[in-house]
């Protein structure tokens, strides 16, 4: 049968065999063929495991993993990483994703929970204030004794208290002045707006009037040209032609 094949058919058969061998070769990070469904953007060998920084990056941006024939593919946002099924870092990432302790979705949930957590210091302060308000009978008795044993304040302290109240009075006066100045400032702001109103209207009417004047001049010039053309095209009055009389001989019968 080999003798019956022509040289051209032998070459064609050889090319088909070479193409079949090329397609069955394993590609870069793709077991089976170049056009397989388990493609890897980066293949990490078992002899050189990834660094700690790279592992942290994978834990943060990892989305899913797929089990292939001899390796596992980890899918990230725009690329993929593959490693052997029995590699320790592969097993660690797989268990982390199964337990939902890492990955892109887990980092989003953690960030959302941080925003929702309430602040604890105000609650503790409120509880401390509530506990300080509760007094035992012994504490109340001590407070009354201390209040009765307090010495009376001298006159100088009273004058100092009065001096301390003066800044408050000055602040009240300044606040009243600012409140009174508020409506005046509003009226002063309204007056420039009222003055600016007529000027804006006049500035808007000036171009309109100029446009109307230009249109009027153009229509007058056009009507003048048309009237001049009509006068030139009208038939001029022709002069009177002379009348020629032919003498007629008188009839002999008459």
Swiss-Prot record:
Transmembrane annotation, as ranges: 206-226
Subcellular location: Cell membrane; Secreted
One Gene Ontology biological process: positive regulation of cell migration
Parts of the chain on the Cytoplasmic side: 227-254
Tissues expressed in: Expressed in T-cell areas. Expressed in spleen, lymph nodes, lung, kidney, small intestine and thymus. Weak expression in heart and liver and no expression in brain and bone marrow.
Protein keywords: Cell membrane, Chemotaxis, Cytokine, Disulfide bond, Glycoprotein, Membrane, Secreted, Signal, Transmembrane, Transmembrane helix
PTM per Swiss-Prot/TrEMBL: Glycosylated.
The UniProt record lists the keyword Metal-binding: no
Gene Ontology terms for molecular function: chemokine activity; low-density lipoprotein particle receptor activity; scavenger receptor activity
Ranges where the record places region Chemokine: 32-107
Intervals, Extracellular compartment: 30-205
CC annotations in GO: extracellular region; extracellular space; membrane; plasma membrane
Signal peptide: 1-29
Disulfide bonds: 38-68, 40-82
Main subcellular localisation: membrane
Bilayer topology: Single-pass type I membrane protein
Glycan attachment positions: 168
Region of interest: Disordered: 146-165, 178-200, 231-254
Purpose of the protein: Acts as a scavenger receptor on macrophages, which specifically binds to OxLDL (oxidized low density lipoprotein), suggesting that it may be involved in pathophysiology such as atherogenesis. Induces a strong chemotactic response. Induces calcium mobilization. Binds to CXCR6/Bonzo.
Protein family: Belongs to the intercrine alpha (chemokine CxC) family.
Protein known as: C-X-C motif chemokine 16
